[in-house]
Amino acid sequence: MSRQDKKLTGVFGHPVSDRENSMTAGPRGPLLMQDIYFLEQMSQFDREVIPERRMHAKGSGAFGTFTVTKDITKYTNAKIFSEIGKQTEMFARFSTVAGERGAADAERDIRGFALKFYTEEGNWDLVGNNTPVFFFRDPKLFVSLNRAVKRDPRTNMRDAQNNWDFWTGLPEALHQVTILMSDRGIPKDLRHMHGFGSHTYSMYNDSGERVWVKFHFRTQQGIENLTDEVAAEIIATDRDSSQRDLFEAIEKGDYPKWTMYIQVMTEEQAKNHKDNPFDLTKVWYHDEYPLIEVGEFELNRNPDNYFMDVEQAAFAPTNIIPGLDFSPDKMLQGRLFSYGDAQRYRLGVNHWQIPVNQPKGVGIENICPFSRDGQMRVVDNNQGGGTHYYPNNHGKFDSQPEYKKPPFPTDGYGYEYNQRQDDDNYFEQPGKLFRLQSEDAKERIFTNTANAMEGVTDDVKRRHIRHCYKADPEYGKGVAKALGIDINSIDLETENDETYENFEK
């Protein structure tokens, strides 16, 4: 019997005799508590919704295949990259960041770009965005970002004042804000945007030699974006425009592809790098650290059930494989805790047993975690009645020392170091990015900024103009004109008392 032909039962298999008429005392009487199907149906319904992600709540996803096209074994011994032509099953989830599950896809926002590779050495999660940088470089600010871009506690509305007050309080945010206000702030859809690992990671080879790397994913469909006006028209008729585009393209066999590249920096180069190479608000220039092709991935299968695969997909940067490692990037270090902890809250401690999260490349039957019990431990028989402690006489839970990573370079005493004393080069890179734009693209940055700052107080607008001017005088003048503010009325050389310097006092 096919699934389409199956007759209705309860969750424990009991046949349901009537799904349309409740059991009552007489034809018009009150309901009886012994109507077990009604009770079951409603109690299940009352619990259908799980907590949504605090960020990246609105998402779309698909399964696919990653294929190695170039040899990078001199940098890493990760088996996923071991030979040209090697293929690995994967899952990708794209998302907006600030909006809730019902948010419109065509909003001006960062896009999440999360990849899960089911390798033979375990799952590798690369949790990135469609931008190479972020708003700040210390994870202690992450909760504040969440609050600033989400709903105001009094009005329960998204508030541009909160948003821009926070962004302009952090001069290092200008790089990301410039990208967000540019044409790339609203991708046409998910297929026509690049992706970035954003953070600095590391690779090591069989000799234990470590290099620092950044991951890039360039769309093979080309870059296409939306103006504010076109995006507004799309949102008015289709709030799921990007999700619809991805799903329908895959359904008709028009499979999207991205090419994976890495940038490589040696440990010696990192020591001599002009800026902190682990600063998430900055990029590595391509002329100094060129893109090196690695492979490509193709998304070729839609999930059969959105909730099972997309909503329950759990990504965490702690899911990393031999041959790959972390870096001193403070934001990455913060996410090593936050992501897994959020998934355990949202999905439960055993969320790794959900099919989309299982280590398919290893096989669930071949893993041997030390964890036991917990809510919904169902897949691996809870390791049965065997030995559940270590050390023991059977060799169970023995370590695998052949997978030890090379020593991780660190230096200095533990202390709350002032990041602004270490690096205050906030404006060089956003200035270079601005100057790369065509004249028309610059004008759109000015207009988009003015649109986004509607309703924001003048003091915050002036703060943003000052930062833009420090990046490039033309940038500051253009934003000032779009906002209707006389740039000559602004002290362009100094910060006022409402800046980040005051926040730290």
Curated annotation (Swiss-Prot):
Alphabetical GO biological process terms: hydrogen peroxide catabolic process; response to hydrogen peroxide
Coiled-coil intervals, chain numbering: none
Residues given in the record as heme binding sites: Y339
Reactions this protein catalyses: 2 H2O2 = O2 + 2 H2O
Cofactor: heme
InterPro entries, alphabetized: Catalase, Catalase_3, Catalase_AS, Catalase_clade1/3, Catalase_core, Catalase_haem_BS, Catalase_immune_responsive, Catalase_sf
Residues at the active site: H56, N129
PROSITE patterns associated with the record: CATALASE_1, CATALASE_2, CATALASE_3
Source organism superkingdom: Bacteria
Role this protein plays: Decomposes hydrogen peroxide into water and oxygen; serves to protect cells from the toxic effects of hydrogen peroxide.
Subunit structure comment from the entry: Homodimer.
Protein name per its UniProtKB record: Catalase
Species per Swiss-Prot/TrEMBL record: Staphylococcus aureus (strain MRSA252)
Lineage: Bacteria, Bacillati, Bacillota, Bacilli, Bacillales
